[in-house]
């Protein structure tokens, strides 16, 4: 399944606030479509599916990528759901977003894809790169790269910098000090339901 490139606000109306996908809030609080306002009891499967879709759309990953993250989280020690969120949050595109260099994760992914971001002084153009504690994330020392990020910073996506990151606005340099803690994850999600959704699939 490919990455979603359609209308973002339509997804937000269906799934609720997705800070990584869009800064816009829908004017209508019900899902889009002819029967958007109809109320019917949802099945447990539908509820789990919706939580899974929140993760997929918020972080901009494909179904295949999400399945691989679930499998990797299962192999790790501790809570599978917590580890799954950590793997998604520590992606380079999401880290660039959380540092405030881009207003959304798709915008951050574009910065990474186009070679505007460095990790420990070397250009890394892989959005899924897993950032580790101690690594320095910076803007490439080129005028075009700096202009793009400075323009993005005029319209930040999230107000607060997570506790595991630090960022110097003058040098456009950030540092990963630790793995993110659960309380700093901006997306409202029940990760246990996502793990349950994949229990028979992944």
UniProtKB/Swiss-Prot annotation:
GO terms for molecular function: rRNA binding; structural constituent of ribosome. InterPro entries: Ribosomal_uS4 (IPR022801), Ribosomal_uS4_bac-type (IPR005709), Ribosomal_uS4_CS (IPR018079), Ribosomal_uS4_N (IPR001912), S4_RNA-bd (IPR002942), S4_RNA-bd_sf (IPR036986). GO terms for biological process: ribosomal small subunit biogenesis; translation. CDD domains: S4. GO terms for cellular component: small ribosomal subunit. It holds the Pfam family Ribosomal_S4. Keywords: Ribonucleoprotein, Ribosomal protein, RNA-binding, rRNA-binding. Residues 90-151 form the S4 RNA-binding domain. The keyword Ribonucleoprotein applies. It comes from the Bacteria. Gene3D superfamilies: Ribosomal Protein S4 Delta 41, Chain A, domain 1, RNA-binding S4 domain. Residues 16-42 are annotated as: Disordered. One of the primary rRNA binding proteins, it binds directly to 16S rRNA where it nucleates assembly of the body of the 30S subunit. HAMAP family: Ribosomal_uS4_B. Belongs to the universal ribosomal protein uS4 family. Part of the 30S ribosomal subunit. Contacts protein S5. The interaction surface between S4 and S5 is involved in control of translational fidelity. This is Small ribosomal subunit protein uS4. It comes from Rippkaea orientalis (strain PCC 8801 / RF-1) (Cyanothece sp. (strain PCC 8801)).
